[in-house]
């Protein structure tokens, strides 16, 4: 392949071949891609409507996307640095996004006007969740500074800073069983270390104590996800996704092996699937009961960064700047398999060129380090 792009002269043969592979793969229309202008780093459900999602992007933009039409129903601006995490208030009225600028931005969903800007972390904000404890709505964030901060959503002030983590926080998740049984709200945290820790939020907040970590992986844990049974699913840079059962004291009962970093994991309760996102660009569908790989959805041409089960589909987002939708109904999956075989014998029409990055070369390297921090 001949090119006038001087960047090619500084790349190895393997790098050039990989770039060409991605260029060719970017032409596919698998998963009905919705194309955006910047890398998608996180996804969250819209609590008020089932056909829309919220996205956090590397450009510093958050948006509300209607999946059926591909229309951006609302765009939320202000940050000038990437947004690695996103969440909404329980009633869906307020949007929150953690940012590289060490703060958490908020917007009124309907008016798109900025709200409180939560400042207090000393490094990237990598995880943010909205919870209710004792009748009080709280925002909880985790950062690359290894701190967990509890915020007052009304005033935007810090209520408590939880120290004790020794590694960068990657993910936070609220324990649904403790909350349902009336016990104090318990939050689990995963980090760039090897373990998972937890803490219960007491009325005074000052009594909040971090548990000792329990080791389940060999390196960074990118995502933790509670299923309806209260068991904990994990995704890690050691190329394994695990199910840690509550009854066993959080021991691994299921291990799903991948060829590369596992970036996200979700469970489809209705149909018994476990879905994983991988750095190798694939979305994998596993049988929850047997732990066997059932199908691989191939379409993204860069790392898959997030997943969301929405009705009978799983939505995936990627740093290839696309949002894709994959079927979860067994009959539709069989049709997808058949269609995939047919495409292997044909040539797909070339779509629009992949959008160019809005980040500088240095920012691209920093973003890659952030996404694959192990």
Language model region names:
Residues 59-63, 81, 101-105, 123-126, ...:
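Short coil/turn segments within WD40 beta-propeller repeats
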Residues 50-54, 74, 92-96, 105, ...:
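Structural hallmark of WD40 beta-propellers
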Residues 67-70, 109-112, 153-156, 201-205, ...:
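Short loop/turn segments that connect beta-strands within beta-propeller blades
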Residues 1-24, 261, 292-296, 301-374:
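Terminal intrinsically disordered, low-complexity extensions flanking WD-repeat/beta-propeller proteins
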Residues 30, 39, 49, 72, ...:
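WD40/WD-repeat beta-propeller blade-loop signature
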Residues 10-39, 69:
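A short helix->beta-strand "capping" segment at the edge of beta-propeller domains
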Residues 43-50, 69, 86-93, 111, ...:
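Loop/turn segments within WD40 beta-propeller blades
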Residues 33-40, 76-83, 118-125, 163-169, ...:
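WD40/WD-repeat beta-propeller blade N-cap
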């Amino acid at each position: 392949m001949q090119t006038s792009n001087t960047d090619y002269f500084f790349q190895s043969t393997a790098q050039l071949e990989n770039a060409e592979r991605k260029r060719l793969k970017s032409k596919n229309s698998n998963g009905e891609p919705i194309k955006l202008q910047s890398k998608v780093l996180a996804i969250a459900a819209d609590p008020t409507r089932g056909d829309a999602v919220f996205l956090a992007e590397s450009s510093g933009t958050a948006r509300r996307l209607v999946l059926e039409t591909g229309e951006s129903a609302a765009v939320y601006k202000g940050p000038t640095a990437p947004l690695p995490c996103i969440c909404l208030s329980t009633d869906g009225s307020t949007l929150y996004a953690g940012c590289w600028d060490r703060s958490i931005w908020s917007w009124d969903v309907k008016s798109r006007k900025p709200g409180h800007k939560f400042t207090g972390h000393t490094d990237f904000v990598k995880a943010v969740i909205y919870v209710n404890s004792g009748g009080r709505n709280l925002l909880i964030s985790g950062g690359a500074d290894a701190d967990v901060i509890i915020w007052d959503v009304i005033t935007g002030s810090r209520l408590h800073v939880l120290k004790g983590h020794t590694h960068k926080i990657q993910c936070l998740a609220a324990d649904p069983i403790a909350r349902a049984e009336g016990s104090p709200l318990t939050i689990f945290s995963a980090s760039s270390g090897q373990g998972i820790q937890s803490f219960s939020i007491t009325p005074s907040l000052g009594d909040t104590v971090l548990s000792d970590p329990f080791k389940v992986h060999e390196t960074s844990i990118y995502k933790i996800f509670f299923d309806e049974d209260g068991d904990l699913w994990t995704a890690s840079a050691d190329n394994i996704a695990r199910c840690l059962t509550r009854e066993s004291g959080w021991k691994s009962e299921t291990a799903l092996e991948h060829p590369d970093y596992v970036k996200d994991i979700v469970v489809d309760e209705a149909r018994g699937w476990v879905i994983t996102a991988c750095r190798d660009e694939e979305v994998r569908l596993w049988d929850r009961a047997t732990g066997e790989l059932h199908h691989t959805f191939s379409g993204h041409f860069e790392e898959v960064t997030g997943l969301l089960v929405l009705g009978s589909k799983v939505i995936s987002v990627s740093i290839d700047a696309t949002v894709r939708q994959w079927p979860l109904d067994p009959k539709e999956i069989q049709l997808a398999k058949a269609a995939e075989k047919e495409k292997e014998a044909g040539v797909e029409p070339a779509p629009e060129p992949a959008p160019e990055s809005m980040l500088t070369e240095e920012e691209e390297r920093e973003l890659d380090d952030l996404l694959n921090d192990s």
